[in-house]
Amino acid sequence: MSRFFANGSDSESESSEEEVQAPNFNKASAFQFSDDEEEVKRVVRSTKEKRYENLTSIIKTIRNHKKIKDIPNTLSSFEDLTRAYTKALPVISKEENGITPRFYIRCLAELEDFINEIWEDREGRRNLSKNNTKSLGTLRQKVRKYIKDFEEDLSRFREAPDQESEAEDEEAHVSDAGEAADDSYAGFKKEASVTAPKIAKSAPAKSVPADDEDSDDSIDWDSDSESETESSEDENQYQNMRERFLKRSTEKGEDKGDDDKRKDKRKEQKLKIRKRAEDDEDGEWETVVKGHVVEKPKMFEKDAEIDIPLVLAKLVEIMSARGKKRTDRRLQIDLLFELRDISDQHNLGVPVSVKIHFNIISAIFDYNQKISEPMKMEHWALLLEVMQSMMKLLLANADISISESVAEEHEEYITAPFYIRGCPLAAVERLDDEFTKLLKECDPHSNDYVSRLKDEMNVVKTIELVLQYFEQCGNPNERCRIYLRKIEHLYYKFDPEVLKKKRGEVPATTATSVDVMDKLCKFIYAKDDTDRIRTRAILAHIYHHAMHDNWFQARDLVLMSHLQDNIDAADPATRILYNRMMANLGLCAFRQENVKDAHHCLVDLMVTGKPKELLAQGLLPQRQHERSAEQEKIEKQRQMPFHMHINLELLECVYLVSAMLLEIPYIAAHEFDARRRMISKTFYQQLRSSERQSLVGPPESMREHVVAAAKAMRCGNWQACANFIVNKKMNTKVWDLFYESDRVREMLVKFIKEESLRTYLFTYSNVYTSISIPSLAQMYELPVPKVHSIISKMIINEELMASLDDPSETVVMHRSEPSRLQALAMQFVDKVTNLVDVNEKVFDMKQGNFFQRGNMGNRGDRGYNRNQNNQGGNWGGQRRDNRNQRNRNQRGHHKNQQQQQQQQVQTIDEE
């Protein structure tokens, strides 16, 4: 009988004999409405119920498609399932504490088994249609990629596939499973739909009562019968069309009855499961797990004699599957560990153990097929342990030599000296790279990053072990490579003992990181044959010197190495290290009061506007076609870990303050110079953009503070300038990041006073006839000798036209430079002259070469230009030349007058 009819159905045999007709319902009754419609209450479902119901409905659809092997629809349903699970993730993380529901894991496991079963059946695959074959390949790839995130849950599920938590049974997932099973059992007593549990006997065969089978059938319904039963229930539940679309009434009596039924059924199921468990305690019966059980391959025969050749042969057999398709890499690692344990149990020697250790390391590296992705944490911890264990064995046994130059046929494991093929240096380099990838993968502001960063101690310890081994038996090239790895973990770390040693607070024999860097780098300078290792060692050495305020040593290394000449030909990683070195060198120069050198070091980084990219500390958003996806992926791989970053705001502030201390006095000295050059283009743009604003509020950002300080310095107001640069907000953002920040702030205030004094003298020198040095010292709170030194230097460099009168301690200003009105008039004359020149050139272009021809357009034979002697030719150029000569004469005369006045002033001073 069809399951779509309203009445219940008998067994299949009875339905085949008797034909039951579908009842004819009155069409009018299907649309009848009652007055009780207002009493029907709406059912409010939670988000969890909605999401889980969506997931279970898609899972049922997938099961139906699997039954008929409809692979294209299975693929589309699987994509819907992944999207639905993504939507349900917030609910799962909130309600289930991030634990994936078991019914979802069961669906993934069943889908994986279904795909593997079809894929292994080659004959069946040949008979599939083209569409099914294509969909099968796509589905297999997507499922294999998707279930990587659920490997642990799947492995736990496959260990105990029939055990399900009570909470999932009772609350969310299969609360109606018992009803569906009972209804389907009552409606469809088909032998094909009932799957009795398979029971394997460990004792002689024992007859099972029929009642037990029937009772177990109601529990162990297959998912197929569940889906059919539930669909038939939905059809038979509604007697007309109206009831189907009405919201379910929530009467207390019905709900209470349903709850009681469900509780009774759950109790019955628990009793049956408990009874089965008690029967299993006798040890005679064993429940067979559904699905194909993969047996672990046997390592050796039972009576085999374990010796070195046998273990090595087994090792070669295990490693021969390396890199092949469908190789179980997890099983391969487990087999290698088991082989190592067998080797240790039979005392086959340290060389065999070292060889197995090295192959375990290779197998762990091979587990992650994508090089750009980091390895799993369980494999990372295992890798560190195995690597350190192998290096300890090598250091404890000096007669073992492991090198990649040893051929496999020349390996020796029995008699000393022992020779093994392998390269621990390559392994530790790969280990270091994996550590960097792990750091890049973590959120730098999370606790995971801190916990991962703690592993650096183990990584450095492993590098130290490899370094000790190669110092005993390695060649210079290998030692240079391992030295560079240690340098790269050391060069960016600040050691306060260095500065204490400079001040004499610790004994002079105290070993510091600077001493270690000197030792490692000098060995590389002497022994390295490759330019790359030497270049990176020099850059790291300069960086370390600059970090510890060894300014002159760092500067001399830069100048002697000539790195700035050929750094453009280096690889991207080396160029990034060069940029980092220049940034840190600029900070060092600033701390050592070399403002001009600090500006020169930082200008190349900051003028581009992309210091973040140049230092490999992040990517700036680009336009659509400026950077492809592949380029972006490569640049992300080059990024530096977060703990090695240089503070960009600190870098920009140091650059802008240095530019301010250089640019503001220069602007004041060349105020009326039309051809004035810019020292810092970035700072000049910031200053000009601020001046264009009609209303400027109080400064908030770091840039606004520097611009406000620059405006105060232009007026000679050093106190306002210092308050803008050194205040609570700027201390928190910038200056407190320096080691010995108080000394840096004192240095800044001192420089601001000196440069404000220079700016004041440049700006107001034409106002004063003479000015007292003590009054200047009092105004800028500087010692009198310091003010005297600054003014003397300005006079010597011909920046200030004045002379010092020592008896009276005054500065006598010379009126050699034009007044403000004269300077503006001269600027006006120059601009008008340029404007006239441009206009005359435009006029010449419009007229063409008519007046430049001697015969006025070849019409001289007609008498038009007779007796003119070419007087009209090039008349505009002649007039321009005459005017320019006249202007030059006027300027020369004015200059002569100035020189005469200056000579007269000098004569008066001498008298």
UniProtKB/Swiss-Prot annotation:
Subunit (UniProt): Component of the eukaryotic translation initiation factor 3 (eIF-3) complex. The eIF-3 complex interacts with pix.
Biased composition (Basic residues): 885-896
Species whose genome carries this gene: Drosophila persimilis
Modified residues (Phosphoserine): S34, S165, S175, S184
Family membership noted in the UniProt record: Belongs to the eIF-3 subunit C family.
Name the record gives this protein: Eukaryotic translation initiation factor 3 subunit C
Family matches, as InterPro entries: EIF3C, EIF3C_N_dom, PCI_dom, WH_DNA-bd_sf
Bias (Low complexity) ranges: 196-208, 897-911
GO CC terms, sorted: eukaryotic 43S preinitiation complex; eukaryotic 48S preinitiation complex; eukaryotic translation initiation factor 3 complex
Alphabetical list of PANTHER family matching this protein: EUKARYOTIC TRANSLATION INITATION FACTOR 3, SUBUNIT 8 EIF3S8 -RELATED, EUKARYOTIC TRANSLATION INITIATION FACTOR 3 SUBUNIT C-RELATED
Transmembrane segments: none
Keyword Phosphoprotein attributed: yes
Gene Ontology molecular function: RNA binding; translation initiation factor activity; translation initiation factor binding
Pfam families: eIF-3c_N (PF05470), PCI (PF01399)
Coarse class of the protein's main subcellular location: cytoplasm
